[in-house]
A protein has these predicted regions:
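Active-site flanking loop/helix segments enriched in acidic
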Residues: 26-52
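Divalent metal-dependent phosphate-bond-processing catalytic cores, especially two-metal-ion Mg2+/Mn2+ enzymes
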Residues: 4-11, 16, 87, 128-177
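Membrane-helix exit/interface motif
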Residues: 68, 94-99, 121
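Post-HExxH zinc-binding segment in Zn-dependent metallohydrolases
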Residues: 109-128
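Active-site-flanking alpha-helical
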Residues: 91, 95-96, 147
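Alpha-helical phosphate/pyrophosphate-handling elements in metalloenzyme active cores
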Residues: 42-81
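Post-HEXXH active-site segment of zinc metalloproteases
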Residues: 98-113
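Alpha-helical scaffolds flanking conserved acidic
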Residues: 23-28, 72-90, 131-138
Length: 177
C-alpha cells in the first residue's frame, strides 16, 4: 500500500501522463484559494472557495458522524459523500463564483455550471448520487448562512447579506422538512 502511494506521488512529481488528471485536481485545489466568495460584493471577511470547501467537507463529516446510527450507508457510500463534498465547487474554479440570483437570471450559466460539474465528477469517478448531493447541499447552505451571518456580525450594512441570511435560513429549514 505505502509503495503504491509513493509510486503515485513520484509520478505526480514527474508529471507522468498516467496521472495527468490528478495533477489537474491538485492544481485546481490550489486555485480554489484565489476564487473569492460572494463575487464582486463588498465583504468585510475575505472568504475564498477553499475555505468554504473545507467548512462544507467538515460539516458533511459531522452530519455523517451524527447520523451514523440512523443511516444505513456502507463505507463506500460514506466515502462517496465525503469526496463529493471535497469537489462540489470545482466548477467555480473554472467559471468563478456565480451567485444564485445571477444563475436564475441567466439559466444558460446554470446549465453550463451543472454540465461542468457532471464532467468533473466523471473525471473523478464520483457517483453523482442524490444522497451525496442532498447532504452536501445542506452543508453548503449552512455554510452560506454562516458566511452571511459573519458579514452581518462584522458590521456589513449591505442589505443583500440580510436578504441572503433570511433566504438561506428559509431554504435550510425547507430542506430539513
Amino acid at each position: 500500500m505505502l509503495t503504491n502511494v509513493l509510486n503515485i506521488a513520484n509520478k505526480l512529481i514527474q508529471n507522468n501522463p498516467e496521472v495527468y488528471n490528478y495533477n489537474l485536481i491538485i492544481e485546481n485545489t490550489q486555485n480554489q484559494m484565489t476564487v473569492e466568495r460572494w463575487a464582486k460584493r463588498l465583504s468585510l471577511n475575505d472568504f475564498n472557495l477553499l475555505e468554504h470547501t473545507a467548512r462544507v467537507t467538515a460539516l458533511v463529516d459531522i452530519f455523517l458522524q451524527i447520523k451514523k446510527t440512523e443511516n444505513n450507508f456502507d463505507k463506500s457510500m460514506e466515502l462517496n459523500v465525503f469526496r463529493y463534498s471535497l469537489y462540489h465547487d470545482y466548477p467555480e474554479v473554472i467559471l468563478n463564483d456565480m451567485p444564485s440570483p445571477v444563475k436564475q437570471d441567466y439559466p444558460i450559466l446554470d446549465k453550463i455550471q451543472k454540465n461542468t460539474e457532471k464532467e468533473i465528477m466523471n473525471i473523478l469517478e464520483l457517483t453523482n448520487s442524490k444522497t451525496a448531493k442532498f447532504i452536501c447541499k445542506i452543508a453548503d447552505i449552512y455554510d452560506c448562512l454562516y458566511e452571511s451571518k459573519a458579514e452581518i456580525l462584522a458590521g456589513n450594512k449591505d442589505p443583500e447579506y440580510i436578504k441572503n441570511r433570511d433566504s438561506y435560513e428559509n431554504t435550510y429549514h425547507k430542506q430539513l422538512n
